[in-house]
Amino acid sequence: MKIEQIYTGCLAQGAYYIESAGEAVVIDPLREVEPYLERAKADGASIKYVFETHFHADFVSGHIDLAKKSGARIVYGPNAKPSFDAYIAKDGEEFKVGKLTFKVIHTPGHTMESTCYLLKDAQGKHIGLFSGDTLFIGDVGRPDLAQKAAHMTQEQLAETLFDSLRNKIMPLADDIIVYPAHGAGSACGKNMSKETTDTLGNQKKTNYALRADMTKEEFVKEVTTGLLPPPAYFPLNVMMNKEGYDSIDEVLERGQHALSPAAFEVAANETGALILDTRDPQVFAKGFVPNSINIGIDGNFAPWVGALVPDVKQAILLVAEPNRVEEVVTRLARVGYDYTIGFLEGGFEAWEKAGKEVDRIKSITAEELAAIAAKEEIHILDVRKNSEYLSEHVENAENAPLDYVNESMLKVDKNKTYYVHCAGGYR
């Protein structure tokens, strides 16, 4: 028996590959499916099932491509209504994989189709719970994402989640290992631990949402308080996971179309494509293609793309390090941005050598800003979170959190000069 968590840090997402006696199952796979196929090939195993815990909002699953390439059956729990061929399991139904058994445990609340998979060994002992977004380490799934689909309020979904946890999960044995779909940094919860697995017994002791003396009213208040608005791309990812999408092979072929500086310029002017520069921010600031935006690939790339580029169908032209184009196209596709239509061959250096127009960002010190402010009225945009701004901010600065900068730009006077202020780091 093999249980492998395949964790992707930039999405704080855990997929799972489980193999026994020549058969395997993959749970909540990412968009690129080769890693799972390679593992099965190395084990001499066939992938029998692709288990989905729910229709994911924060990433596009690889379930459809993986099923096509491996012959596996896609399985969802009760209430799921996908537009493609899949098996909808009943609560309590069991699936054999080699010498292992997986039991479907329907746990509505995060979404109404949310389902956990209880793993039993050859002797029938319960050894693992693949809990999706129902139960995280230190937290539970937020109950506000499926309100429209479920025709329920977040309070009603929270009540449903409370019942699922108390009736379906908490009665299970303490020594079961919990394998969640996400860890710290995911927007699917608000207080996740940096740990990515734990025993259920320890979670009963330390996870606020599993407190034995907690009333339903207390639970509802706790899980619905302090929820930040979800990223705009979440419902679009749900739709793709439910209705289907282009194969990752098509997306990669389209995105890796090399364009000379001249052809790149024509494409930018004629297609309305967004120019996305994924180089290091410090390098970008020294020179970039006019009208491009910078989201560095070495960081929480996909979530920031989702926050700053509201339309997943937006055509994208890439400026990237030449040896990382495939990586960038793949990471965009993970969150549903499938319409990369080409990249600048030779990178920004080729653009510069071709004598094309170049923009730059000027950085100044706090002392320089203070000196300017002493002489004239200036306009400062503080792009930190509102909580950071309220804690302390530069006098007369206007708060425009980066997560919602598109909305803030509607209020910006294009005839004024703005000084942008942020804390240090990737953001």
Regions found by a protein language model. Give the residues of each.
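Active-site neighborhood of phospho(di)ester-bond hydrolases with catalytic His/Asp-centered motifs
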Residues: 26-27, 47-56, 74-79, 106-109, ...
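Cytosolic catalytic domains that perform sulfur/thiol-centered chemistry
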Residues: 158, 171-173, 187-427
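Metallo-beta-lactamase
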Residues: 111-230
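Active-site metal-binding motif and surrounding structural segment of the metallo-beta-lactamase
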Residues: 33-75
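Core dinuclear metal-dependent hydrolase active-site scaffold
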Residues: 2-6, 16-19, 94-124, 128-129, ...
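Divalent metal-coordination and catalytic microenvironments
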Residues: 18, 28, 54, 66, ...
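Conserved beta-strand hairpin/beta-sheet module of binuclear metal-dependent hydrolase folds
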Residues: 1-46, 117-132, 137-138
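Active-site metal-binding loops of divalent metal-dependent hydrolases
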Residues: 29-30, 55, 79, 111, ...
